[in-house]
């Protein structure tokens, strides 16, 4: 047993997935910083092993959140948006920060599947799974797996910056950091402080600020049950999360629902 809390002999290792010439890494729909960072870590590993590697996400919405677009651009992350895929994925499909068949990820047609995630088990879809829900971020899990392969993460500053930012965002700016492995990764990464500051200070665009402000001004509040309902203009789904996070910091609001219309569907 080690800090990760599981016997190493029962953990899927990355070298078990090297038998495929083609590897597709899929983040969950509406990917956040942790999903993108985790996918990028796996992308770098398989690319450097000579594999034909793709990093993509699917779903109804393309990434439009300012900090995530900057993250992808500044760290040169080759993230593709694949809204539809009719052909079966060639080679191996790895879902990262999500589980194949779960509700937050589009199910791409694939015959060979692996799962790497830091959330509790949702779907049993393959024997090739690495789930460690005791970790604060999936970036930490991917970093751990790269360390097991003696992969030189420290030589890739873009990757180090991505992993650092993934952990930062998924642990609420490190305020929910408790696992020693998360702390080990944070202390060991070679990252660009200026880029982290840029991402941190670009969490919302001026247009998104306007959408959030108008939505909160029109908040419907029930004093008896202390809940709020907010209808937002069309926006990135992550902005709905920002609005709800802010609203839950208001005294007297214990529960909230924030939603937007999507054509004829809410």
Predicted segments with their positions:
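Short, basic, glycine/proline-bearing loop/turn elements
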Residues: 67-71, 87-89, 225-233
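Active-site environment of divalent metal-dependent phosphoester hydrolases
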Residues: 62-63, 116, 237
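Active-site cofactor/cluster-binding pocket
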Residues: 73-128
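Anionic-ligand anchoring segments at beta-strand to alpha-helix junctions in alpha/beta enzyme folds, i.e.
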Residues: 20-86
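Residues at the starts of beta-strands that form the adenosine-phosphate
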Residues: 22, 52-54, 92, 111-112, ...
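A structured phosphate/pyrophosphate-recognition subdomain
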Residues: 2-30, 40-47, 123-263
């Amino acid at each position: 047993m080690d800090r990760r809390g599981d016997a190493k002999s029962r953990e899927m290792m990355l070298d078990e997935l090297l038998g495929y010439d083609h590897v597709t890494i899929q983040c969950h729909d509406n990917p956040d910083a942790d999903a993108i960072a985790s996918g990028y870590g796996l992308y770098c590993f398989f690319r450097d092993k000579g594999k034909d590697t793709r990093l993509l996400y699917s779903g109804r919405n393309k990434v439009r959140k300012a900090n995530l677009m900057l993250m992808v651009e500044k760290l040169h992350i080759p993230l593709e948006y694949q809204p539809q895929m009719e052909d079966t994925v060639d080679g191996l499909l790895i879902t990262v920060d999500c589980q194949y068949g779960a509700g937050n990820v589009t199910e791409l047609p694939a015959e060979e599947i692996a799962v790497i995630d830091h959330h509790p088990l949702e779907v049993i879809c393959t024997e090739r799974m690495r789930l460690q829900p005791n970790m604060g971020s999936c970036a930490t899990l991917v970093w751990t797996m790269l360390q097991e392969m003696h992969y030189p993460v420290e030589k890739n500053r873009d990757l180090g910056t991505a992993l650092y930012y993934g952990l930062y965002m998924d642990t609420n700016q490190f305020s929910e950091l408790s696992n020693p492995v998360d702390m080990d990764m944070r202390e060991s990464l070679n990252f660009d402080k200026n880029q982290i500051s840029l991402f941190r200070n670009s969490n919302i665009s001026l247009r998104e600020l306007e959408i959030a402000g108008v939505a909160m001004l029109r908040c419907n509040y029930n004093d008896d049950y202390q809940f709020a309902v907010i209808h937002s203009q069309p926006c990135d789904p992550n902005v709905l999360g920002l609005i709800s996070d802010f609203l839950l910091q208001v005294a007297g609001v214990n529960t909230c629902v924030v939603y937007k219309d999507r054509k004829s569907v809410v």
